[in-house]
Amino acid sequence: MGFQKPPGTQDFLPGSVERWQFVESKARDICRRFNFREIRTPIIEATELFQRGVGEATDIVEKEMYTFTDRGNRSITLRPEGTAGAVRAFVENKLYGEPDLTKLYYIGPMFRYERQQAGRYRQFHQFGVEALGAVDPALDAEVIGLGYMFYKEIGLSGVTVEINSVGTPAVRAAFRGELLGFLNPIRGLLCKDCQARIDRNPLRVLDCKEDQHLFEGAPSILDSLDEESRTHFEGLQRSLTDMDIPFTINSRLVRGLDYYTHTAFEYKAAGIGAIDTVGGGGRYNGLVADIGGPDQ
């Protein structure tokens, strides 16, 4: 009996590897222009890092992580995303002691136990950037602009940018009650995943593709923003406009991770299949402190 690659993985053979090298070289070139420096972290991390950083009530932590107990009886997880490991390295190696803003990027494999479908793999490659040490919304715009330029330079046409503000933890706590008031009467109409999310992480319900038709008339988190969050979001929009980055506001865009504050964004590309989101991210003001570092 011969061996086959595990489900949800790919072999990259001569011919396809050259295309990967082209994409990676474009990513590195753009990062150099924006003064981001490369970081390489382990593909395994302590499971608690993702539980604390990504959020225990997220789909990633609840259903998608590859986790095992090693011979030292430690719970270890193959990294499902790059931010938590990059921030862990930032804290552990005390990069926050540097006088300037820390701007990092990484390229590498990530692992999630995804349901097999077109465009979804259990081992996938991620290019990400992290900018730590500044609260200016112009930095959020710079990160969004870097990604937008990357897609243009690799030849991906028709890319659009969607943005939202998810506010501060206090804003989300207040909005949570308002949203539950809308969702509870239609709970029985929601898909099984959303019914499970309502009590633990109701904002994630708004991200559901299957139930979007039920959310007409849902409250908007933008109406709940405090002055700090509103000022930050307005500053982001001005900076994107100054950079000639076209964008639309999507008040239901919340992303699937718990660490975001203020800015959330996604890149969409038409004509690439059923899954049109090709990238995304956001700001995470509290993540460094959550992982044991100083407030950033």
Q: Where do the model's predicted regions map?
A:
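TRNA-recognition modules of translation machinery and tRNA-sensing kinases, especially anticodon-binding
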Residues: 1-296
